[in-house]
Amino acid sequence: PSTLVLDLGCGSGALGQYLATHHSCVIDGLTLSEVEAAHARPYYRHVHVSDLETCDLSAQFSNHTYDYIVCADVLEHLRKPERILDACRQLLSPTGQLLISVPNAGYCGLVAELMQGEFLYREEGLLDKTHLRFFTRRSLQRFLREHGWGIEALDTIQRELPESEFKARFDHLPPAVARYMLGTPDALVYQFIGVARPGLEACANPEHEPPIQTARALFTSQLY
């Protein structure tokens, strides 16, 4: 049987296009824009146009349960992301998984900007002007745990500072401070990608962080 996927915040349907082309998946989606929905529909079984903040997901998708629900770059845009977590619990199959991605508010470039008294919203990136919620590794796992979810796996996307929107800010730090920050856990993690299940005791210890990246810090600091 085909894998059933619900893509929340599907946008123009890039994920659906990939899954429909390369995998045996039946995909439903939801997006805020009718224009985006029109682009997505060729690859999705159903695409609903609605606001995640106010819609009743359980009612919109009441006849289905899913093997995977995807919230890719979604939770940070919501005032009450816990509402979506509650709805997803009802829509997952008994063995289903929630796939999420969120930006890392502990990225060293963002922290460097804060240290210089700035918190500058941008058109895109970690401080996208539409972001309402911010997460670090610990706070993400705590947030999920408090709302009845556990992390089964957690991966990261890293971005070197010269490739980020914060390079200029980091360049103004004293060298000793820059070296210290680059050595902290998740310093260069730009985004977290997680797999979660309802009620699962977090397999990735919420207090666990990767070891200090001394070698990486030394190498990277030599760029500045």
Q: Which residue stretches match the model-derived regions?
A:
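A short beta-strand submotif of the Rossmann-like class I SAM-dependent methyltransferase core
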Residues: 68-74
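Conserved glycine-rich SAM-binding loop
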Residues: 11
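Conserved alpha-helix/loop element of class I SAM-dependent methyltransferases that forms part
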Residues: 1-2
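Conserved beta-strand/loop positions that form the S-adenosyl-L-methionine
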Residues: 8
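S-adenosyl-L-methionine-dependent methyltransferase catalytic module, highlighting the catalytic core
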Residues: 14, 35, 39, 52-55, ...
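A short acidic, Gly/Pro-enriched loop at the edge of an enzyme's catalytic core
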Residues: 58-68
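Class I SAM-dependent methyltransferase SAM/SAH-binding core
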Residues: 14, 18-56
